[in-house]
Amino acid sequence: LASFSNPVFFKTQALRFSTHGIPRFISCARIENGYLALPRGCLDDAIALLQEQNISPLFDDKRETGKPLLKLTPEFTLRKNQRDAVATITKHDFGILHAPTAFGKTVTAIGMIVKRKVNTLILVHSRQLLEQWQERLRTFLPEVTIGSIGGGKRKPIGIIDIATYQSLVNKKDNSITPLIQDYGHIIVDECHHLSAPRFEMVLNEVRAKYVLGLTATPERQDGHQKIIFMAAGPIRYKVKQSPDEQFTQTVMIHQLYDIPPAELIKTDERPKISDAYRWLVNNEQRTSKIVSDAYECVQNGGHPLVLTERREHAESIHSRLTEMGISTVVLKGAMKAAERKNADNHLQSAQVVVATGKYVGEGFDLPRLDTLFLAMPIAWKGTLAQYAGRIHRESEGKTQVTIHDYVDCALPILQRMFKKREKSYKAMGYALEYFEGNSDKQPSLKLENVPSSNTKQK
């Protein structure tokens, strides 16, 4: 019930790499004081298994029901699909809300707090998300004092608190703060991170009667999504990933043919993605095209977000746009507190936001953004959905969203990554338009695409 084959082990084994230290099976069960402890997500299967054997289980419910919250006056109105989600989820004590970015998972979760009416702890994995939750709760529940644990601060109130899961783990002995057992309702934002060992440890100590997970991408690249469902429960409400009715969705695919250095095109060995990224960062012509396209977008009234996977690349793009007279803000990892505060202060007025994907890939909320420049290639559909979600926020006057994708056709590894993105774009309802790049070099490898009915060739 609580064990599964580890996909990472078998993938590593298939590649003939060493599997030392990689478990063949992963178990989320444990023996505790003579009892077999199963994750809450296994409850339905355990009951079904017992009933198949004509065994009627007896229940001794020791869950924490929490302190009642009687005076909650919400300053918002849920949309119909959000009300439907709340109505469905409240039929269950635990489970996951699976909805795409821009559905409004945060406000729906606040609606669940109002519905449950018990003290609540919201668990996040980053300080950025903690701050965003603080802002939303102060807006939608202004009469409630919000506590927080994380980012160097520890000020829980016991009514509605927000915490980074890392701040609940004692680094010396890996023990979990007993505080987590005092809440009747736990909300786990971006719950696909639950497979992280320490995050799972935190949730194992939760006694709350109600547990709600929020995610846009429950599938994980490592195949460990079963841990998520065991820890938080099954998906109780899923919003279909249908083509967005509010926006016209287009991907501009720029096919580039710059010849990579010899070491990347050796036929006897596959290049490392880190080496390919290094070449892309140092490719002046490619970076100049991205900067030029972003500049043109601003001149045409667009609000672009430029995403890359390397901090030095973000700085380079930021510097070039600034030199062209474009107001630009850069967001990246390892920023000092003063730098982050300065960036946040200029975020609303900046014409272009340049960022690393890991910094703004989840939870980043700037509704006016309508154009995404994918300056570095990625492959995983979950990451692409998160990135695309940054431009799907509702904003007055926004009717169209556009993604600019730069495909380096001369390198097979980058072509293969694009084929995965291409499939994901179509699944998200985007129309694809193909453009030849600005290189005067002849293509060494042509992009193998078969335009579909919603694809235009330029």
Predicted regions mapped to residue ranges:
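Conserved pre-motif I regulatory segment
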Residues: 27-31, 49-52, 57-98
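Conserved helicase ATPase core of P-loop NTP-dependent helicases/translocases
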Residues: 131, 146-149, 154-156, 305, ...
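Post-DEXD/H (motif II) to motif III coupling segment of the RecA-like Helicase ATP-binding lobe
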Residues: 184-185, 192-253, 425
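Conserved interdomain hinge at the start of the Helicase C-terminal
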Residues: 268-309, 315-320
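Conserved RecA-like P-loop NTPase helicase motor core
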Residues: 332-427, 431
